[in-house]
A protein has these predicted regions:
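NAD(P)-dependent Rossmann-like dehydrogenase/reductase catalytic/cofactor-binding core
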Residues: 2-16, 25, 39, 186-197, ...
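Rossmann-fold dinucleotide-binding core
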Residues: 127-197, 201-205, 433-502, 510
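Structural motif
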Residues: 23, 46, 81, 88, ...
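Structural/interface elements that position substrates and couple domains in central-metabolism enzymes
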Residues: 44, 76, 122, 186-193, ...
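Rossmann-like NAD(P)-binding element
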Residues: 67-127, 357-358, 372-433, 441
Length: 605
């Protein structure tokens, strides 16, 4: 087997990588060519198709023209950028390149053929980079005559806009090659993350498991495509929902990546959901085909058009029950936030805590929150005062006797919630809707603690409730249609986006979010990547507002572990077992920001 060799010709000073050949001029190859040319590199674009080469030139002309219109390039800079790019249909055009980047379709045979041909064309010191995100860099390197000069260079789409670049080394790659390419990536204005070789690397390794679970969730008819996507956008702050993202990536591409990941991990979470195979083989591969999970205006269009699965607004509806007053049980952050939301929407609110003192303290916190909204110009002083006046604090749920909707927001403990629901059953009037805000416990267990299970439903708000737009509406097998309709109508009146889901662990958001977080912990546990690199990769490559470890420390490691245990117990999938590292940190009392230490340490206030 070949081993990495020391080669001074690979030092950054000796090899500044001024000329780069890009093999494969599809969307990604064209984007990479633009990035390189705008950074002053001479680019040789190579594709066997003259049509693809012509499309590349046209796309570069259009893209740089838009950059001029937006003030990001001058006309002179545009002309220089375009002049740096030449195209060819002959791989021999790469002979003078310092670096060759291949971004051809994900096929070992095709990539190996290109690398073998390049071995006989390029100079001995030339570095060969594969743009794969699914195939083994090591296998490609081992088949090359220069394994020490082969590495992975994974840009994200669209390459001109996305800052992250993953640089993947095999066990054969020379450190000097990695250093030279890292310097180039920095010079391009990108954020390099250096990693080892495994399918998916960091970003796609975490992202595609999540996308696969979303596809499986949709396939099981647990929730609609619109609700799954809305839940992840509004509940996690993601720029796109998972099913829309699969359509953008290409369902066939996602299937290929997942097949490679499953072959390496044998983790059921990576086994492609059957619907991905069905859609791929039917040619319904997403936006590029004009249809995937959604239907588009035309192939290549991003405009979604209605189809047979689009929810109809004009269909028959079950009328909801009238709701004028709301009881909120609890005095913590979530209960206070929910009470504020209802009061601002014009509802009379009874806020019940374990003592009247706690209830008054919760109302005082709501007053401060309303004052902050006034200071930020989001609310008038008069509206804030009126909202606060609508809240009546009390130390007993007996004062819920006349409310139309009772919302439980106490500790995430099933026995505590069941006891409270037994109390609500006794004190609330007939016909009152009883809702739990649980994020992971079975709603039906709360319902069975009452003599009126048809009146019980889940209303999972997200924290902070006044700011977060999402509410997961959770029907049990016993929930009455008019109770479901009531909660949907109430969500509209309090300006929340309601998504429907069934009563199973994690509902939509947590069932998709926490396995992703758990897999990030496993990555660190296996010493594949650092906390910082993983957080950077998911923010810059996945569009997440926070990296997984930033989020875990905010949520609380104990809370996260509890949710992951519930998911594992319900679905009994070995891949959902909580990472031992997470369990060890919780056992040590390192719970995140609230204790000053979690995955990171925080300054004490």
């Amino acid at each position: 087997m070949a081993t990495p060799q020391s080669d001074t010709s690979l030092s950054p000073a000796a090899s500044p990588l001024r000329t780069v050949a890009v093999v494969g001029l599809g969307t990604m190859g064209t984007g990479i060519a633009e990035v390189l040319a705008r950074a002053g590199r001479d680019v040789i674009g190579i594709d066997v198709s003259e049509t693809a080469a012509a499309r590349c030139v046209a796309a570069l002309e259009a893209s740089t023209a838009r950059a001029v219109e937006r003030g990001r390039l001058t006309e002179e800079e545009r002309a220089r950028t375009l002049a740096r790019v030449t195209t060819s249909t002959d791989l021999a055009a790469a002979a003078g390149a310092d670096l060759v980047v291949e971004v051809v379709p994900e096929s070992y045979e095709l990539k190996q053929q290109i690398f073998r041909e390049l071995d006989g064309i390029v100079r001995p010191e030339t570095i060969l980079a594969t743009g794969t995100n699914a195939l083994s860099v090591t296998r490609l390197a081992a088949d090359s005559a220069r394994p020490e000069r082969v590495l992975g260079l994974h840009f994200f789409n669209p390459a001109p806009a996305m800052r992250l670049v993953e640089i993947a080394s095999s066990v054969l790659t020379a450190p000097q090659a990695v250093a030279a390419v890292t310097d180039l990536v920095l010079d391009l204005g990108k954020e390099p993350v250096s990693i080892g070789d495994r399918p998916g690397f960091i970003a796609d390794g975490l992202l595609f498991g999540y996308l696969n679970q979303a596809a499986a969730m949709y396939e099981s008819r647990y929730a609609s495509r619109e609700d799954i996507d809305a839940a992840m956008r509004l509940g996690c702050g993601l720029p796109m929902g998972p099913l829309a993202l699969l359509d953008l990536i290409g369902i066939d591409t996602a299937r290929t990546v997942l097949e490679a990941m499953y072959a390496a991990s044998h983790d059921r979470l990576h086994a492609p959901a059957p619907i991905l195979k069905q859609l791929s083989e039917a040619g319904l591969t997403g936006r590029k085909a004009g249809r995937g999970f959604y239907t588009y205006e035309a192939p290549g269009s991003g405009t979604v058009v209605p189809d047979d699965l689009t929810p109809r607004e004009d269909g028959p509806r079950t009328p909801g029950r009238p709701v004028r007053s709301v009881g909120v049980a609890g005095s913590g952050t979530m209960a206070s936030g929910i009470a504020e939301v209802f009061a601002k929407a014009g509802y009379e609110v009874v806020l019940a805590a374990r003592s009247e003192e706690k209830a008054r303290a919760a109302k005082a916190r709501i007053g401060k929150s309303l004052s902050r909204s006034v200071d930020k110009g989001r609310l008038t002083a008069e509206a804030a005062a009126q909202a606060l006046d609508r809240i009546t604090p009390t130390g007993t749920c007996d004062d819920f006797a006349d409310v139309d909707l009772a919302v439980e927001a106490v500790a995430e403990d099933l026995e505590v919630k069941r006891q409270l629901f037994a109390t609500l059953d006794k004190v609330c009037k007939p016909g009152a809707v009883l809702a739990t805000t649980t994020s992971s416990l079975p709603v039906v267990a709360c319902a069975r603690a009452t003599s009126r299970p048809r009146d019980v439903i889940g209303m999972h708000f997200f924290n902070p409730a006044p700011a977060m737009k999402l509410v997961e509406v959770v029907r049990t097998v016993l929930t009455a249609d008019d109770v479901h309709a009531t909660v949907r109508e109430v969500c509209g009146k309090i300006r929340k986006h309601a998504v429907d889901c069934g009563d199973r662990a994690g509902f939509i958001v947590n069932a998709l979010l926490f396995p992703y977080l758990n897999n990030a912990v496993k990555m660190v546990q296996e010493h594949y990547a650092s906390l910082d690199d993983i957080d950077t990769a998911m923010k810059l490559g996945g569009g997440y507002p926070m990296g997984p470890f930033e989020l875990l420390d905010v949520v609380g490691l104990d809370v996260s572990l509890a949710i992951e245990k519930v998911l594992h117990e319900e679905f009994r999938d070995p891949g959902l077992a909580p990472a031992p590292l997470l369990e060890h940190l919780v056992a040590a009392g390192c719970l995140g920001r609230k204790t000053g230490r979690g995955f990171r340490e925080y300054a004490k206030r």
